[in-house]
Amino acid sequence: MKEDLEIENDDLWERWRCEVDKGQGKERIDKYLAEHMTNTSRSRIQTAADAGNVWVNGAAVASNYRVKPGDVIQVLLDHEPHDYTITPENIPLDIVYEDDDLLVVNKPAGLVVHPGHGNYEHTLLHALAWHFEHQSSIVNRPIVNINDPSIGLVHRIDKDTSGLLLIAKTPEAKAHLAKQFFDHTTERTYNALVWGTFKELSGTIEGALARDNRDRTIYRVWDLEECPQAKEAVTHWRVLEQFPYVTLVECRLETGRTHQIRVHMKHIGHPLFCDEKYGGCEILKGLRTQKYRQFIENCFALCPRQVLHARTLGFTHPRTGERMFFDSEWPADMTALIRKWRAYEPNTLL
């Protein structure tokens, strides 16, 4: 069996792919996968198949499908259900679009997406629980239970990143949308302010990512020979606007690894402005004057987080087949910061 185990996002999904060997006899796919996938039960695979998350040669199959040589199998597994209950919290939401199948929300910086790692309250999912509970009594829409693992988040963004997020409201929508993320047929662009200026106007960063062995809370680019479990990642970037010592860039994700843009931009020498985890909270470029230092400190105070915004999101609607595209304007803190840099004159800070 030729296999490629890939974890696109260790908070939400385990994504697995293999090609069945030539000598393989016909066998139920749930049994075949349980024998070849580590720490995965047959019942878990059956659950994935029931949700439409097991595909052979691009088509969803049932758990009783019999594999044959040459079959290309893809599996998308939810992580095991969490042992806590998400209770409704009245947290304001900026809902960009909603129908019976899905919801697109514009997440503010500072809001954790889902519980975990010490954050078990005041998350986006708690806000969604409130929204769905109260919406059902006002609008003629079915009740959505955010604790149902077959619905919910399709992807995520970091706590201090703002911008667009997609939520599935039915199991069918989640399976369809998850497959689009798995196949990289979604469109996602981010706007980021980074340290330094560029000689080129665009480029591509390719570098496999895994946790840093010296600090498990951050990621780094690895050589695959040195760290075989690192996950390949590709980021395309282009310059939107250059300032004297920082640059506004657009990043387009080909893959969706944790901290991908933040790690990749640091890797090429351009950490995100005010990104504490990846070295962007230091004065990396510019003048050695007290006035300039004060200017940067004022900038940090104006937007005290990594300057990263999930600007656009494109995908195919899981029920209608319509191609949908959403654009989110910068939040107030990022807008104010960019305006400050546009007004900056180096000779006034000598």
Say what each PLM segment does.
Residues M1-L350:
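RNA pseudouridine synthases
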